[in-house]
Design a protein with these regions (language model features):
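Surface-exposed loop/turn segments flanking beta-strands in extracellular/periplasmic regions
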Residues: 1-6, 61-84, 127-158
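Outer-membrane beta-barrel transmembrane strands
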Residues: 2-58, 86-109, 114-116, 124, ...
Length: 189
């Protein structure tokens, strides 16, 4: 309709929409060679953190938009059809923490028999939460905070949710190779 004028939609006349994204990914890793105990033995592990926080605000402002009637030779303002001043504010955050520990062994005997094996433990935990709020019928768009919107129940809304998941597992693998011609592999999880 007339309120979806493409020229107006690419301007900030009908309002603004701003979103901020913040992300942090860390994965420190350590490896220790345990050749002093037996050649080819090692231990390694890591701790991974994936964190994100996002927030945003959209502000809808009414604007003047006219249609012309050639029958009456008059312009009609459709500002009422563009809505009232309203604000939608939201945020969400999530984090995943993963811990992994592994002990492994790699060695070749008599230049013919190669053994490569490891056993590993891993656990991961994920958390997510979100919060949102909406208000309409502001007197002005100069203070677009939720507190300054209408206090009437029909003119406001809010919501949110959260999720938490976790997992733990053990896994491992044993490889045996003979003169790089024959290979046997066993995997367990």
């Amino acid at each position: 309709g007339i309120t979806n004028n493409a020229l107006l939609m690419v301007s900030d006349t009908p309002g603004t929409n701003k979103t901020n994204y913040h992300t942090l990914n860390l994965k420190p890793k350590v490896r220790i060679d345990l050749d002093a105990l037996t050649p080819g033995l090692y231990a390694e592990g890591y701790a991974a953190l994936d964190y994100s926080f996002n927030d945003g605000k959209s502000i809808n402002t009414p604007y003047d938009i006219y249609s012309y009637s050639s029958a009456t030779d008059e312009y009609t303002n459709h500002k009422d059809a563009t809505g009232a001043i309203s604000v939608n504010s939201w945020s969400n955050k999530s984090n995943t923490i993963t811990l992994n520990a592994r002990i492994g062994y790699t060695r070749t005997f008599n230049e013919a028999h190669r053994i490569d094996a490891f056993a590993s433990y891993e656990q991961s935990k994920y958390n997510y939460s979100s919060l949102s709020g909406y208000r309409t019928n502001y007197l002005s768009s100069a203070l677009p905070d939720l507190d300054f919107g209408s206090k009437v129940d029909a003119d406001k809304d809010n919501g949110g949710n959260s999720t938490e998941t976790a997992r733990q597992n053990w896994f491992g693998r044993i490889n045996y190779g003979y003169k790089d011609k024959y290979l046997a592999e066993f995997t367990i999880r």
